[in-house]
Amino acid sequence: MSKKYLTKDFFFLYYPWIYTTNGYSMERIVFHIDVNSAFLSWSAKQVLEQGYKVDIRERVSVVWVEEKRKCFVLAASMPAKKLGIKTAMNLYRAKELYPGLIIAPPDYKYYKQCSNELIKLLRKYFPTLQQYSIDECFVEYTEDIRDYWDPITVATELKDFIKKKLWFTVNIGIGNNKFLAKMASDFEKPNKVHTLYKNEIKEKMWPLAIWELFGCWRRMEPELRKMGIQTIWDLAHKNKQFLWSVLGNYWKVLWELANGEDNTKVIDNYDERKGMGASSITRIDTHDRDFIISFLERFAVELELGLMDKELSGNVINVWVRHTDFTYKSHQHRLSHLINTADKIYEYALLLFDELWHGEDINLVGLGISWLKKTEFKQNTLFSLITH
């Protein structure tokens, strides 16, 4: 796929019915691009490249992570999910559900490579791109591609090209803001394109169960149900004073999302000289320290890979968590020397984490390194924490 796939001439020649000399609707359009079961998909791609004859995406399979002799499911295939095997589940429990479970170890170096390949491909066509995590990003379609009438066609062409070129599938959500685009990408999977425009909220989003609203956690669901809030429509039409009494200050955020309101910009984070970071929701509210620090371990490896790629080192480490009431807490520490290896980043991250966390439930954890400088990269125990 060359750049002609995303040019005015290409669409006028091959899709004349979608092009108009009056231009496109000036309503803002955002794409959310999300790799389907990313770690599982990338492990499947890796073993296929190594000669394995079976695509584990089509089998009951998981990628697992070990932390202090506890094994957790890091990612599950679609067939595994249908059997009730979920992210964060104890691996032994997953094996009880399906004794023939195929298990694959994580390879974060390879995952980072796959992520970089995707972002590099997308940047050829979308100058304004915000990488949201290792496996998802937002692009500002309206600003960057002003001559196209039908974003669905563009998204479908892009989705198919990613599958052909990179050997893994993505969902692409299209909406009038980042929130709607992200909600759309979570509709039916895998390898799909979905829209959720403002005029489609009533039909596509409001009938959904309240826990399917991005930003609304299952922990909230029982209390909301007691108040008669079972669907997103119920939340969108509740009295604001009533919501404040139930949700506190977070009511405004959820109410705005339930009504499809989101004014946040797609912020290009291409310039990594200022700092690099990684964060992830834990999928569940948890106070399991071993499970939480397994994320920090993974992030340390991701950061080493990014630093190595850019030949950078840094001396400020930052760790942050999000509590179940959606308040954030962070700690950072400035070192007297530069570091760039996973083992050192992880070492300081653990110290910071234990300072800021006191056993309470959290649902997001993040790790960053900043004050970066160009330096010779020293490889000490690269990936040894995870892969050996």
Indicate residue ranges for each PLM-predicted region.
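DNA-contacting surface of Y-family translesion DNA polymerases
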Residues: Y24-S25, E212, M220-L364, L372-T387
